[in-house]
Design a protein with these regions (language model features):
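Short beta-to-alpha linker loops that shape the active-site pocket of alpha/beta-hydrolase fold enzymes
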Residues: 40, 63, 68-72, 143
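Short amphipathic alpha-helix adjacent to the substrate-entry channel of hydrolases
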Residues: 28, 47-65
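N-terminal cap/lid segment of alpha/beta-hydrolase-fold proteins
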Residues: 1-29, 81, 152-153, 158, ...
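Short beta-strand element of the alpha/beta-hydrolase
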Residues: 30-39
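Surface-exposed, flexible loop/turn segments at secondary-structure boundaries
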Residues: 22, 42, 72, 113, ...
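Catalytic nucleophile-loop/oxyanion-hole region of alpha/beta-hydrolase
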Residues: 45-47, 67-102
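A fold-wide structural signal in alpha/beta-hydrolase
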Residues: 33, 58-68, 106, 136
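Primarily recognizes the serine-hydrolase "nucleophile elbow" in alpha/beta-hydrolase
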Residues: 86-155
């Protein structure tokens, strides 16, 4: 397995795990990639939802990557979303060299990472409409409910305000 560590805008990183071709399957070189987006309430990036998950997908035959995105005060102004778009773009940019199927890139997001992954598939942020999007989503307990039942701490971290009206 090859390991690559890429720097992203705003201090984010993308850790990429590329499977090697094996003798038993010499014709299986190009593979889909699962980009794991850990949760953490936009206060931290959960270690248990990152590399361990990516390595399970790698064991199942996928190339994988883990996004370490901006959190806390740094998460404002859609920086995590821009970092996600940059990560998807880098994977597609290197797809041929890294033996990745560029039209088979999935995001696997947990909690706040699920919110970020879903946002990456449907974002409608001015200036980001043409950013790369995933081909598939796997969402595990995503933070997607706002209003009365919201995980308020995640939305406060993301928006920078305690005002509940801003979270609806």
């Amino acid at each position: 397995m090859q390991l690559k560590q890429l720097e992203l805008a705003g201090g984010g990183t993308l850790t990429v795990y590329l499977r090697d071709c094996c003798e038993r399957m010499p014709n299986v070189l190009d593979r889909p990639l699962v980009l794991v987006v850990p949760g953490g309430g936009y206060t931290h990036v959960s270690p248990r939802e990152g590399d361990p998950v990516a390595l399970q997908f790698a064991a199942a035959g996928y190339h994988t990557a883990v996004l370490h995105y901006a959190v806390g005060e740094s998460a404002r102004d859609a920086l995590p979303m821009r970092q996600l778009a940059q990560a998807i773009g880098l994977v597609r940019q290197h797809a041929e060299r890294w033996n990745i199927l560029p039209d088979k890139i999935a995001l696997c997001g947990f909690s706040a990472g699920g919110h970020l992954a879903l946002s990456g598939a449907v974002w409608d942020i001015p200036g980001m409409a043409d950013q790369p999007r995933p081909n598939a989503l796997l969402l595990a307990y995503p933070v997607v409910t706002a209003g009365e039942y919201a995980h308020r701490d995640s939305f406060v971290q993301l928006t920078g305000t305690q005002d509940i009206a801003a979270h609806q």
